[in-house]
UniProtKB/Swiss-Prot annotation:
Binds 2 Mg(2+) ions. Its EC number is 2.7.11.22. GO terms for molecular function: ATP binding; cyclin-dependent protein serine/threonine kinase activity; metal ion binding; protein serine kinase activity. The gene is pct-1. The lineage of its organism: Eukaryota, Metazoa, Ecdysozoa, Nematoda, Chromadorea. Serine/threonine-protein kinase, which, in association with cyy-1, regulates the trafficking of synaptic vesicles in the DA9 motor neuron and probably also in the DD motor neurons and in RIA interneurons. InterPro entries: CDK, Kinase-like_dom_sf, Prot_kinase_dom, Protein_kinase_ATP_BS, Ser/Thr_kinase_AS. This is Cyclin-dependent kinase 17. Belongs to the protein kinase superfamily. CMGC Ser/Thr protein kinase family. CDC2/CDKX subfamily. The keyword Nucleotidyltransferase does not apply.
């Protein structure tokens, strides 16, 4: 055994310096716990064996007075028991079940320390009281075990092992050594209480230190790291000012300043946004051209440079003037329907014409479902062959949809050219119609109301799908929809028979009817009622056959037509100027079974449209087909031209007849 260390002596002296109540000074107890835990291996333990070994310690028991002996023994027992109880506190906690831990045993453990302090003159306890005596088994603790603990005192404490002594032997101790041993027992009881008190105080602090050590262990000093932020501040020499994020050596988080990354500030350069960048950033339509004054105003808006959120986007659009009724001027009325009225207007922002679709809001029902569908679908469709929704204005009584203005539709276009369109223009319009439908079908949007009145034709010759009031998104799996869709002339036979289970093929039948009308100049199936419409279809295409058209023939509404047999009337006789490829594509559109109809994506690759598809296959969705090389609209022979041509032909005939009459008379 080695000699008793002076560090241990100082720690013991600090423990006993508090007088009769050493618990009052909490800081001294914590310091003592740290000294015990951080002592090196050279500071060896001091136990009862070292007290009794006169040769190793160097100080004999007989060299000291009786009072100093008692004080020294009391002091040694206190320090030893403190370390001994630290060893107990490092042991795992044994959790007892509620049924195993009796309240009577808990009271016995709490009152154990009081019973150890009984004087030697106390009366002898009864047999049932002798069972409450608790003797603490003290184990030795080595300095190596103490060094493994970070603080010397752990946060978990376990009650000392209870060995109930049932011995009835009560002898009076007469020697000073026996008296000192009894005081050592008292000190041992106090050490247990002291250890429990310190452990409870240390439990909260250790948890905070573990969190702090867990956070600081991830920090490493690095010279190569640097963060550059933008600022308008420059130094006196014209260079950027290097700013430290902390003004003192002590940071708020307790991290040393050497771990803080240096932040260099540089001058912020004002970025100027172009019109195309603003349109892309604010998701504006491609055909909407902002004036120069509006672009300059947006460049001065601080929200444009900030990260784009929904709130910042709305703020920027409001700065421009979107969402405000005063931005648009109402001019004249274009048409009126069940729920809405369409006006021609002018945008004060861009000084261009727009179409204002005013939807009346009922006080109880609110906005009609057709308007909600149209808004929800069009706001996500951005294509050159789909009409563009510019703005939405909501008031108490009206919901105004602002569209791009197109002055005529396909029906008006066919009437203007006396229903005799150029074949090149027919191919070009059909390709644009299929291109827009393929875009919508790819996004699982069904138009469900295709007709020439809903296909807008611009002055350049661009075709745009419009009036998505009956459109809806197709869900997966296929849902049942209403059969009261599509104008009667362009409604497929399965829908006429009451089918509500359909998909994108509902639009392809209407494409075939529109193609025939552009070529022939008249409607293919102009029925007045659903029954008359089905009769026209069966007489033209022939009666459905159960082996080839089971979906049609199994419908209960088909029974009145089951006994009627019609032979098909070849359509090629009605449209003689169409070629074989065009007629083949037309018949692929007009199929009884919806699954047999060609899709829009397949139709654009058909040989009838190959010359246009080759030149337009590289275009983006937002680009018009007229931007491709070699694609243009041919000049149509208008109705006025037909009238003037007939008058010239009539005048020429009169001149010839007059010349013949003059010649014969002269003869």
């Amino acid at each position: 055994m080695t000699a008793y260390s002076p560090a241990d002596s100082n720690a013991e002296a600090r423990l006993l310096s508090g007088g009769s109540d050493p618990i009052s000074d909490t800081e001294n107890l914590l310091d003592l716990a740290y000294e015990v835990g951080t002592s090196s291996s050279d500071n060896t333990r001091y136990d009862r064996e070292s007290e009794n070994d006169e040769e190793e310690i160097g100080v004999g028991w007989e060299d000291t007075t009786s009072s100093s002996l008692n004080k020294r023994m009391c002091k040694s027992a206190t320090f030893h028991d403190f370390c001994d109880d630290s060893e107990y506190s490092r042991r795992p906690v044994t959790t007892l079940h509620e049924e195993d831990f009796d309240e009577e045993e808990e009271d016995e453990f709490e009152d154990a320390s009081d019973r150890r302090n009984l004087d030697e003159d106390d009366v002898e306890y009864e047999d049932e009281d002798d069972e409450d005596d608790i003797v603490v088994e003290e184990e030795e603790i080595t300095p190596e075990d103490i060094e493994h603990s970070p603080t010397g005192v752990t946060t978990q404490t376990t009650p000392p092992s209870n060995n109930t002594s049932k011995s009835k032997k009560k002898k009076k101790r007469k020697s000073d050594e026996e008296d000192g041993l009894r005081k050592m027992k008292k000190s041992s009881t106090f050490a247990s209480f002291l250890n429990m008190f310190v452990s409870r105080r240390r439990s909260g602090r250790d948890s905070g230190e573990r969190l702090m050590s867990r956070s600081t262990c991830m920090l490493r000093p690095s010279i190569s790291l640097s963060v550059v932020q933008e600022s308008m501040i420059l130094g006196s020499d014209g260079e950027s000012v290097e700013v430290s994020p902390c003004t003192s050596d002590q940071t708020p988080t307790g991290v040393p300043p050497r771990y803080i990354v240096n932040v260099k500030m540089r001058q912020k350069t004002a970025r100027k946004w172009s019109e195309e960048e603003i349109q892309k950033r604010l998701s504006l339509p491609a055909d909407l051209r902002l004036p120069v004054a509006v672009v300059d105003k947006l460049n001065r808006t601080p929200t444009l440079d900030q990260p784009l959120t929904r709130k910042n986007r709305r703020a920027s659009l409001s700065e421009i003037g979107f969402g405000k009724l005063e931005t648009y001027e109402k001019l004249d009325k274009l048409g009126e329907g069940t729920y809405a009225t369409v006006f021609r207007g002018r945008s004060i922002l861009t000084n261009k014409f727009v179409a204002l679709k005013e939807i009346r809001l009922e006080q109880e029902e609110g906005a009609p479902c057709t308007a909600i569908r149209e808004v929800s679908l069009l706001r996500n469709l951005r294509h050159a062959n789909v009409v563009t929704l510019h703005d939405i204005i909501h008031t108490d009584r009206l919901l105004t949809l602002v569209f791009e203005y197109v002055d005529r539709d396909l029906k008006q276009y066919m009437d203007s050219c006396n229903n005799a369109m150029q074949m090149n223009n027919i191919r070009l319009f059909l390709y644009q119609l299929l291109r827009g439908l393929a875009y919508c079908h790819q996004r699982r949007v069904l138009h469900r109301d295709l007709k020439p009145q809903n296909l807008l034709i611009t002055a350049k010759g661009e075709l745009k799908l419009a009036d998505f009031g009956l459109a809806r998104a197709k869900s997966v799996p296929t849902k049942t929809y209403s059969n009261e869709v599509v104008t009667l002339w362009y409604r497929p036979p399965d829908v006429l028979l009451g089918s509500t289970d359909y998909s994108t093929h509902i639009d392809m039948w209407g494409v075939g009817c529109i193609l025939f009308e552009m070529i022939a100049g008249r409607a293919l199936f102009p029925g007045g009622t659903p029954t008359e419409q089905l009769g026209l279809i069966f007489r033209t295409l022939g009666s459905p056959r159960p082996d080839r058209h089971p979906t049609i023939c199994e419908k209960p509404t088909f029974y009145p037509y089951a006994n009627r047999h019609y032979n098909p009337d070849p359509l090629c006789r009605q449209i003689p100027r169409i070629d074989a490829h065009g007629f083949e594509l037309l018949m692929k559109f007009l199929q009884y079974e919806g699954k047999d109809r060609v899709s829009a994506a397949e139709a654009v690759k058909h040989p009838f449209l190959r010359t246009i598809a080759v030149k337009c296959c590289h275009l983006r969705d937002e680009q018009s087909v007229l931007e491709a090389d070699g694609i243009h609209i041919e000049r149509e022979l208008l109705a006025s031209d037909h009238h003037h041509s007939s008058r010239r032909h009539h005048r020429g005939t009169l001149v010839k007849d007059k010349y013949r009459m003059h010649s014969s008379h002269h003869t």
